[in-house]
Design a protein with these regions (language model features):
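Hydrophobic, well-ordered beta-alpha structural blocks that scaffold small-molecule cofactor pockets
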Residues: 1-51
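Phosphate-bearing ligand-interacting subdomains
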Residues: 35-91
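Short, intrinsically disordered, charge-balanced linker/junction segments flanking boundaries
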Residues: 93-95
Length: 95
């Protein structure tokens, strides 16, 4: 089963989760320090103990500096950090 761990369960994190599901990720779970629901399996600092169970992860915070900070942490720990781009996304030829 293709699974993904997302750090950040706010609005941006939920959008990333929907996109990940469109890409074929069957199990998507979150780490978040503030949001509490059934999809949130712990706090952000728990990323260190979740690596074996979820080797693929992304940081999905709206704040760019926070997203970069956590992406660096994930990479240092050895996580695979994929680009999550919706399959229907289109890039302009003039971009």
């Amino acid at each position: 089963m293709k699974s993904l761990l997302i750090l950040g369960a706010g609005g941006f994190g939920r959008m990333v989760a929907e996109t990940a599901q469109a890409l074929g990720y069957e199990k998507v779970v979150f780490l978040d320090d503030a949001v509490k629901d059934e999809a949130v399996i712990g706090m952000c600092c728990d990323y260190e103990i979740r690596h074996e169970e979820y080797p693929v992860a992304v940081a999905a915070f709206g704040n760019n500096k926070m997203r970069l900070y956590w992406t660096d942490k994930l990479l240092e720990k050895g996580y695979e950090v994929p680009a999550i781009v919706h399959p229907s996304a289109v890039v302009s030829p003039s971009a």
